[in-house]
Amino acid sequence: MTVTIATLGFPRIGPKRELKFALEAYWAGKTDADALLDTARDLRAKTWTRQAALGVAHVPSNDFSLYDHVLDTAVMVGAIPAAYGWSGGTVDLATYFAMARGDQGRPAAEACGPGCGHAPGADGVPALEMTKWFDTNYHYLAPELSPGQAFALTSSKPVDEFLEAKALGVHTRPVLLGPVTFLKLAKTKAEGFSPLSLLSALLPVYGQVLRGLAAAGADWVQIDEPCLALDLTDFERAELRRAYGALTHAAPGVRLMLTSYFGGYGENLATAVNLPVEGLHLDLVRAPDELEAALAASRESLVLSLGVIDGRNVWRADLPALLDRLEPVVARRGSDRVVLAPSCSLLHTPIDLDLETALDPEIRQWLAFAVQKVEALAVLAQALNGGRASVAAALEASAQAARARATSPRIHDPKVAERLAAVTPDMTRRRSPYDQRREAQRARLNLPPLPTTTIGSFPQTTEVRQARAAFAKGQISDATYEAFLRQETARAVAWQETVGLDVLVHGEFERNDMVQYFGEQLAGFAFTQSGWVQSYGSRCVRPPILFGDVSRPAPMTVDWWRYAQGLTRRPMKGMLTGPVTILNWSFVRDDLPRETACRQIALAIRDEVVDLEATGAAIIQIDEAALREGLPLRRGDWDAYLDWAVESFRLAASGVADATQIHTHMCYSEFNDIIAAIGAMDADVISIETARSKMELLDAFVGYAYPAQIGPGVYDIHSPRVPAVEEMTTLLAAARQRLAGEQLWVNPDCGLKTRKWPETQAAIVNMVEAARRARAS
């Protein structure tokens, strides 16, 4: 027997973002369902055959999704809220995409095309609530469940895709999101109701799926229960035992590989190793010390999947060092009971480093994307099966790359270290308490009650993207590109004045991404051409690679702010991305504590804040959209993270006078458990994403007696749906029941970059009218 390799999941989007473009063409009505599904089928085929060719013995299937795997699971088990008008049977694409993106409810004659995702003639309904997948930058759609929820098998996707791969000659290991994690991720509108109470109703459907896979020929099935990386109660652990007892009994011919990731099992390890499954995956990147405990606690027959290659970051592994750890494990456990794998699904990494033809060669040799990570696993397996000499050249190349990175002068900047050492506590505090700052800001800004604004970005149209691409390729000059951007900015400013917004933004047309734009102007970052990863649905991002010490060589946003402010007498916000978000939305160096890297970024942003104020900016927004997602999965680790995250924000924000108003923005967030940290950030105004939660997220601010101002999002920008004025006035009324009117701002949930202008204009006009009505009431 030999050591084999597995992947837990592979990127879905395609090396050239084929899925993104197929989805957007379908939604726009330019293509039909057959074209979309053909693209999806082609991507799956290439992914399966490529992994098999690289030597993966356990190739995953059912890890592909048209939008989100949690949504796929909800559809598979028939968890379709009544609002979507589903009457049983197969869930069609219109219903599927309505759950993902919302449903404007246009009459059939006005439907935007066969791929719009709207159910013509139905009442408009919002999308399911979207939130972050554990502590990653991927978003999932939260299932919406209710007491008495009925489940039924309504999709054959897992079996269909297993058979699809089988027809190509690839025997796969299907992947299912586990029933306990599925229920823990679900939302409910029923007070005091726990979705986990539905486990007994859900398990028979999972049993049907497993039996169907067994009948199709599957011998292993991977079941993901990442909830095992969380703090679980004794009851939840008991429910896991009950669930897996039932699943093992339901399909005795199928071997189950239980996977958890993004952290160790901790106090859940005893439960995990004793579940009636044949295999258990360990995330040995996040929890390297858990290997010995798992070996000692588990039965000899349990197959251990060792997640030794980082599935969430882009750094090349030191293979000889990994072999030093793995060789004793194989000798002790036996090669037939060891599988090598990434720490988690490779969904979170770019696909192929070979596509990066323009990347700095020195930095490139330090990196590994999904394909290269699989190749690294193959080298490890060959070394374990055939000896190190059989892959000597690959091992030496790996060791040489590790040495080169560790000794490169591009990693460390003594000036950055000196500046960081000179930071004092006073640099992380505003000059006066909030009450005093509020009066100074009121006098300076003279805004009406319930002031209206947007979060920052406006739609990046085809014309904007084409101009950016032409500029990047050298097809247009600097002057031509800047003139185009000025024209777009001027149009956006004029439109905002016309519709009556109180505080304006310049639209960010010059920015490709809210993190990449800043990273490109900061020392210590590198960027890719094709390093795309999925954020949600068709939304893809190219995270910067933070490889060295960070500093700001020159001002980054001042010129664009000065130009935009010169077009209007209304306040123009300076728009910055905060240090914690830049950190959390980047691939971060692993040779330095994250908090140290974050403080370096904070000093760079502080310089920009001070320069904006000196240029005349009265309002400066420092977005910390990703503050919460950086939270460790274990509560016991939260305080340490929040301490340095809040300190980093304050270090960036505290260099200004009392009359300068500091805004921040957070999205995808639940605030109850971090409200004290949000208060400690000491921002003058915070805008948050609340529309999908119907303002319930504000309850945290009420209980905390949050003193500063808040802009609760009054409509969901992740959906193309345009909310009615009455819908937004209802949300504002709900907000005013929770907070004093003088605390409230009126704004969308998030930036508008991914929306189209017609829906944006209609929604903002309605929002401004809703604010006017609310002021008059």
Curated annotation (Swiss-Prot):
UniProt: 5-methyltetrahydropteroyltri-L-glutamate binding residues: R17, E18, L19, K20, K132, R539, C540, W585, E629
Keywords: Amino-acid biosynthesis, Metal-binding, Methionine biosynthesis, Methyltransferase, Repeat, Transferase, Zinc
Residues the entry annotates as binding L-methionine: I455, G456, S457, E508, D623
Record InterPro entries: Cbl-indep_Met_Synth_N (IPR013215), Cobalamin-indep_Met_synthase (IPR006276), Met_Synth_C/arc (IPR002629), UROD/MetE-like_sf (IPR038071)
Residues annotated to bind Zn(2+): H665, C667, E689, C750
The family this protein is said to belong to: Belongs to the vitamin-B12 independent methionine synthase family.
Protein name as catalogued: 5-methyltetrahydropteroyltriglutamate--homocysteine methyltransferase
Highest classification ranks of the organism: Bacteria, Pseudomonadati, Pseudomonadota, Alphaproteobacteria, Caulobacterales
Gene: metE
